[in-house]
Amino acid sequence: MISVMADEKHKEYFKLYYFQYMIIGLCTILFLYSEISLVPRGQNIEFSLDDPSISKRYVPNELVGPLECLILSVGLSNMVVFWTCMFDKDLLKKNRVKRLRERPDGISNDFHFMHTSILCLMLIISINAALTGALKLIIGNLRPDFVDRCIPDLQKMSDSDSLVFGLDICKQTNKWILYEGLKSTPSGHSSFIVSTMGFTYLWQRVFTTRNTRSCIWCPLLALVVMVSRVIDHRHHWYDVVSGAVLAFLVIYCCWKWTFTNLAKRDILPSPVSV
C-alpha cells in the first residue's frame, strides 16, 4: 500500500515537469532531423579558390570527434551531477534546496534536487543542440577546409571566365563531407562543450563546497576542445566564439527558468518605524 502511494506521488511530481520534458524531446528530435536529413542551401553558395580562409587542408582524423565530444560534454556533465548527488552528498551545501521550486509532499529533498539539476542540464543540452543545428543550416558558412573537401573540377574551372564558383565544380562524391563543409558557423563542438562544462562549473560552485581550483577543469576542458576545432581546420576562430556565446545564453536562460531563489521569500519585512 505504501509503495503504491509513493508511486502515485512520484507520478504527480513528474507531471509538474511535462512541459520541460516535451521541450527536451522536441529539441532533440529537431536537432537529429537537422543533422541527418537537412543540408544547407547550396544554390547561392559562391567561393573563390584563392580565398585563404577556406583553403586549409582537410584532416580526416579529428583530435576530438563527434562521439568524443558527446562523451566529454553530455556524458561527463551528467556523471558529475549524478555522482555528486548519489555518492558525494557531503559536498552539497545545506541550503541548496532553497534555490529550487517548491517540493511536493512525499518527495525527498535529495531526489528533488538531483532531478531538478539533471532536468536543467538536459534542457540546456537539447535547446543548445536545436539552436546550433538550425543556425548552421541558416548561415551556411564555409569551413576553413572547404576547397579541399570540394575537390574542384579543373576542366570546369578552365571553361569558366569567372573567378568565383559554385558547388557545381565540386567533384566530391561523398556528399556528407561536402555538405558538412557548409556548416561552419557556429561550432557545434564549441556550443556543446561550453554549454555542458559551463553548467557543470556553475552548478558545482553554487551547490557544492568545491572551490574554484577543484572546478577549473571544466573551463580548461572546454578551451581544449574549442582550440582543437581550429587546429583541425574545422572552424574559423569566430565559429568557436559564436558557439560559446550561444551556449552561455542558453545556460543563462535555462538556469533562470529552472532554479528559483526562494530565499528572498523567507526574509521578514523591515519593521515599520512610528
Swiss-Prot record:
The keyword Transmembrane helix applies. InterPro entries: P_Acid_Pase_2/haloperoxi_sf (IPR036938), P_Acid_Pase_2/haloperoxidase (IPR000326), PA_PP_rel (IPR043216). It is an enzyme of class 3 (hydrolase). Residues 228-239 are annotated as: Phosphatase sequence motif III. GO terms for biological process: phospholipid dephosphorylation; phospholipid metabolic process. PA phosphatase activity is magnesium ion-independent and potently inhibited by N-ethylmaleimide. Also inhibited by phenylglyoxal and propranolol. GO terms for cellular component: Golgi membrane; membrane. Residues 34-69, 140-189, 232-237 are cytoplasmic. It is found in: Golgi apparatus membrane. It is a multi-pass membrane protein. Its EC number is 3.6.1.75, 3.1.3.106, 3.1.3.4. Keywords: Golgi apparatus, Hydrolase, Membrane, Transmembrane, Transmembrane helix. The chain crosses the membrane at residues 16-33, 70-87, 118-139, 190-203, 215-231, 238-255. Residues 186-189 are annotated as: Phosphatase sequence motif II. It catalyses: a 1,2-diacyl-sn-glycerol 3-diphosphate + H2O = a 1,2-diacyl-sn-glycero-3-phosphate + phosphate + H(+); a 1,2-diacyl-sn-glycero-3-phosphate + H2O = a 1,2-diacyl-sn-glycerol + phosphate; a 1-acyl-sn-glycero-3-phosphate + H2O = a 1-acyl-sn-glycerol + phosphate. Residues 1-15, 88-117, 204-214, 256-274 are lumenal. Catalyzes the dephosphorylation of diacylglycerol diphosphate (DGPP) to phosphatidate (PA) and the subsequent dephosphorylation of PA to diacylglycerol (DAG). Together with DPP1, regulates intracellular DGPP and PA levels which are phospholipid molecules believed to play a signaling role in stress response. Can also use lysophosphatidic acid (LPA) as a substrate. Substrate preference is PA > DGPP > LPA. Belongs to the PA-phosphatase related phosphoesterase family. This is Lipid phosphate phosphatase 1. The lineage of its organism: Eukaryota, Fungi, Dikarya, Ascomycota, Saccharomycotina.
